[in-house]
Amino acid sequence: MTKSELVEKLAARFPQLLLRDADISVKTILDAMSEALADGHRIEIRGFGSFGLNKRPPRVGRNPKSGERVLVPEKRVPHFKAGKELRERVDRTVTQGGGMNGNGHAPHGKTGQSQLGSQSPASLHDDGQLNLVRS
């Protein structure tokens, strides 16, 4: 789901909201979340999950062009941990045979193929058996 799809869903769910107002609402929420993470805070949305930061320690890397050793500084990266309710809902959807294709992604169209037309590398049968497709 893209941000614009989320805006459209919000506007459809609340008809009193203009599309412009739904867009402003979504942007405001995302900006607040981004700012909180940038300030080093943790975000918890009960039933959905939490956003936090993981620290990556400094390390020595290599410049791929020259092969020269380069010091890569410490950095913080955003991390999402799904909450129990979200994990259970996703698992229930997968085990009931709907909503996901075999590679762990939601299908893009009615055929279950991605927008590029590639076929899923695996499929899950109703009996729980996994079928891997080799190319």
From Swiss-Prot:
SUPFAM superfamilies: IHF-like DNA-binding proteins (SSF47729). Keywords: DNA recombination, DNA-binding, Transcription, Transcription regulation, Translation regulation. Residues 111-122 have a biased composition (Polar residues). GO terms for cellular component: chromosome; cytosol. Pfam families: Bac_DNA_binding. GO terms for biological process: DNA recombination; regulation of DNA-templated transcription; regulation of translation. This protein is one of the two subunits of integration host factor, a specific DNA-binding protein that functions in genetic recombination as well as in transcriptional and translational control. Heterodimer of an alpha and a beta chain. HAMAP family: IHF_beta. This is Integration host factor subunit beta. It comes from Cupriavidus metallidurans (strain ATCC 43123 / DSM 2839 / NBRC 102507 / CH34).
